[in-house]
Amino acid sequence: MSSFHATTIFAVQHNGKSAMSGDGQVTFGQAVVMKHTARKVRKLFNGKVLAGFAGSVADAFTLFEMFEAKLEEYNGNLKRASVELAKEWRSDKVLRKLEAMLIVMNQDTLLLVSGTGEVIEPDDGILAIGSGGNYALSAGRALKTYAGENLSAKDIAKAALKIAGEICVYTNDQIILEELE
């Protein structure tokens, strides 16, 4: 599977709420849709953290497990767990080959974590990854900026992914949506 050509993950913090959405499509190679309802967004750490992945499915399961272990080790400190995961991911010979990216968030913090060691916190409370990430990011920013008073974080996350799914062939309309309150 080519890296990141199988999904879109979008996350937003808005009006004191945090929401993350992901599509359900799993693509094998460049031409075959293998699954329509994969769950790429999950609640972790007793429902206090959301995590979403783009990339190889097997790699993502490994990273979810590692990230949850880091959350436990650092008592739910999202930034510390993310930095430690990125350090281990970048420095380990086997893990370095994993083809995935993660978005993680709690009520206060939103982060992008990658295998090259980046842990990035956006300025505007919005992140998107995957093949449809740029479409979702653009839609989400427009929605938050121009309709934010009338929409919840959950509404923005759902609409941004729906728009990305209408444009990106690797993103479908089987949206998984999680929210932290």
Curated annotation (Swiss-Prot):
Positions annotated to bind Na(+): 165, 168, 171
Stored CDD domains: protease_HslV
UniProt feature coiled coil, ranges: none
Gene Ontology BP term (one): proteolysis involved in protein catabolic process
Location of the protein in the cell: Cytoplasm
PANTHER family: ATP-DEPENDENT PROTEASE SUBUNIT HSLV (PTHR32194:SF0), METALLOPROTEASE TLDD (PTHR32194)
Family: Belongs to the peptidase T1B family. HslV subfamily.
Subunit relationships: A double ring-shaped homohexamer of ClpQ is capped on each side by a ring-shaped ClpY homohexamer. The assembly of the ClpQ/ClpY complex is dependent on binding of ATP.
UniProt protein name: ATP-dependent protease subunit ClpQ
Organism, scientific name: Bacillus velezensis (strain DSM 23117 / BGSC 10A6 / LMG 26770 / FZB42)
Recorded name of the encoding gene: clpQ
